Each structure stands twice: as structure tokens, then as C-alpha cells.
Swiss-Prot record:
The gene is NA. Inhibited by the neuraminidase inhibitors zanamivir (Relenza) and oseltamivir (Tamiflu). These drugs interfere with the release of progeny virus from infected cells and are effective against all influenza strains. Resistance to neuraminidase inhibitors is quite rare. Residues 30-451 are virion surface. This is Neuraminidase. GO terms for biological process: carbohydrate metabolic process; viral budding from plasma membrane. Intact N-terminus is essential for virion morphogenesis. Possesses two apical sorting signals, one in the ectodomain, which is likely to be a glycan, and the other in the transmembrane domain. The transmembrane domain also plays a role in lipid raft association. InterPro entries: Glyco_hydro_34, Sialidase_Influenza_A/B, Sialidase_sf. Keywords: Calcium, Disulfide bond, Glycoprotein, Glycosidase, Host cell membrane, Host membrane, Hydrolase, Membrane, Metal-binding, Signal-anchor, Transmembrane, Transmembrane helix, Virion. It comes from Influenza A virus (strain A/Chicken/Pennsylvania/8125/1983 H5N2). Residues 71-451 are annotated as: Head of neuraminidase. Homotetramer.
Amino acid sequence: MNPNQKIITIGSMSLTIATVCFLMQIAILATNVTLHFRQNEESIPAYNQTTPCKPIIIERNIKYRNWSKPQCQITGFAPFSKDNSIRLSAGGGIWVTREPYVSCDPSKCYQFALGQGTTLDHNHSNGTIHDRTPHRTLLMNELGVPFHLGTRQVCIAWSRSSCHDGKAWLHVCVTGDDRNATASFIYNGMLVDSIGSWSQNILRTQESECVCINGTCTVVMTDGSASGKADTRILFIREGKIVHISPLSGSAQHIEECSCYPKSYPNVRCVCRDNWKGSNRPVKLDINMADYSIDSSYVCSGLVGDTPRNDDSSSSSNCRDPNNERGNPGVKGWAFDIGDDVWMGRTISKDSRSGYETFRVISGWATANSKSQTNRQVIVDNNNWSGYSGIFSVESKSCINRCFYVELIRGRPQENRVWWTTNSIVVFCGTSGTYGTGSWPDGANINFMPL
């Protein structure tokens, strides 16, 4: 080979070797990359793969209430809440209301009332003594919060009841014509069912809380004469839907405005107003939530709970029948049993809705005409107005406590200086401790109030 050929041959061989080395480097790089990604794929869990984005829903373990605990043993009642709504109304911006009540969900208590579609300092408050108008609505606030302009209007109603089944609120709301009213059943904020008047004479309900056990709620409703025979029915509702209706049975002659409480599953017990024949506060109304059976009678205590009533020395009750003592008109009230005894509340005046007292009657639930009274407390002194009252139940860790509210009515018909009628509220709950004395009236100076 000449020198030029040697140079060309060496150059060609070098280029070939370089090309082979380059290709080998590419092959090694490709192998490393492949092995790297395979190793990562094996170490990545399956849930890291790409999936559609969906909201994560965490369900709470919400249960229906069963009220299976025993009733708390109490020595009397201690102050719990007072809303002072009429005193605050002097500055304006507070609803005109009446017929208040209190009911609690598993964690918090609320106060309810029927609003008149106006505030006290407005001309529309003139004439609010009337019970049934299309402007009345059910108001709902946390207990202790007066019904200000931001208050929620739950439904249209001039008669109603509310209760919480452990999952949601049920509201039974009656409104419409006296001769053809409608009751709407609102559950969890939605209208679920309804029922029309069955006697065409002011369909009405409890004006205090209903009771729910294991998802079924019961409410007492009456349609018919307020001073004669009427048709009372007990409705059973599940998540807003009527599932059964039972007629009244037993010896009760007239039932209105029941104050009900859970009592020894599957029973609900109510004490109601006889607006016709008796001042002995019917009704030991016993409702069986399991088989829908009903029984009724009268509170045995000879110290009777309605207003008007006879003097205590001449009042009576035989447990089974109305006492025919000043039975008409009457007022909403409450009582509850504790063994054979009965705790009860009533106006201090036997003739009018003034003052308020509570006491325990020994054997007042079991023995006719019992009159042995103990643990008396004055809630409102007799120089101040009271009104409706009712019961509500609160479940603690170990027992079921009984509480009550008193409506403190001001304005007409007793105070004619003003044109309106409204109320505030005071609330007490059972206590096993000691307690003092006092009086908790509405407290508004009528001369400071708008006319």
C-alpha cells in the first residue's frame, strides 16, 4: 500500500469503530431509561393512577332518637333562658309574636313562635290580638335570641308543632280558612305531605313540640268545636310522610294544645287542654308508637292545672272524667309523671292568666283527688301576666330532663293603652340540685312602648 491508501484504510477503520461505539452508547442509554421507568411503575401504587376528580363524601353516623334513657330525678326547676323581646322591642325591629315554644335537636335548643307579619313599632301591629291570619308564620331562632328581622320564617302557620327525629326537623304547619285549613308537613326543609281539614272547624295542633322515636314522629291534631264535641286524631309521620292516623280513644272528652314528652319506649305521653268540660287538665294521653294504640284519661291531682278553675279547696279530679268545674275556656299547660307523683305548672290566679307556679303533687298521677303539694316555686309573681306554657325534653348523657317555658303576654286584651298583643318567654329546666327564689316577669314598662 502506498502511504495514501494506508491513511484511508486507518481512517475508515477508526470511523467504523467510532460508529459502533456510538450505537452501543445509545443502546446502553435506552436500556437504562427502560429499566428506570419499569422500576418506578412497580413502586407506584395503583391508586396513584389518573382517575376522574370526584368529591369525597364523609358520612356522619347520624341516628334516629330513641329516648331510651330514664327520666332525670329532680328536686325542682332552675332558670335557663329569657329572651326579653318586648323590652327590646321598645327600640324597634322585633317581631310581634304569640304562642311560643321550645324544642331541641341533639345538640342545641331553639325557640319558636307564631309571628304576626310585623314588628311591634309598626302600624301593622294594630289588631294583632287575632289568632288566625294568612300573615302568620312560624319563626325559629336559637334559644335566647329574640325574633329580630333576620329571623327565619319556617312556614306559613297559625297553628303548628315541631320536633327533631335525630336527623332533621319536622314542622307541622296549619294555615288557611277556618272552615277548610291545610296542615303542611315539612321535613328537612322540604314539603313532603299535607292533610286538609276533616271537620271544617279550625284544624289545629299542639302549639309545642311533637315527639319522634326511632324515626317516627307523632302529633296530636283536633278539628271541631272549641267548646263542644270535636274530632281529635293522632298522626304518625316518618320523614315528613303520614304513615298512620289513629282516632282518639279513652275517657277524654275534649283535647286541645297537648304538651307531649317521650316516656318509656315505645310510649309518648301528653297532657292537654280540655276547653269544654274540665279544668282538671286532661289528659293522660298515652300514645304507643309501636302499634299506634291510644288511651286517654285525666290527671288525678285534685289540685287542677287549667285556668279558670275552682279554688283548691273545692277543685277535684277522679282520674277518668272531666270535673265539670269551669271547663271553658282554658289555657295551654303541662304536667308530667314521676312514679305515682306529678310535677305540674299553672297560673297563680285561678281566674286569669297572671302569675305562674310549679309544684309536685304526691300521688297526683295515680290517686284520685290527691292534694298533697310539695316543692312549690314561683316563676312569675301574681302581679304580672303569664300565658301559655308547655314542656320540652332534653337528653343528657345519663337521663332525660324535663324543661318548660312560660309565655309572658303583654298588650291587649289586658293592657288597652296599646293596640298590639305580643309576648316574651322565660324557660326553666329540671335540676337535682338546690335552688333559690325569685320572679321572672316580662318586665317591659308599657308606658315606654310604641302604641
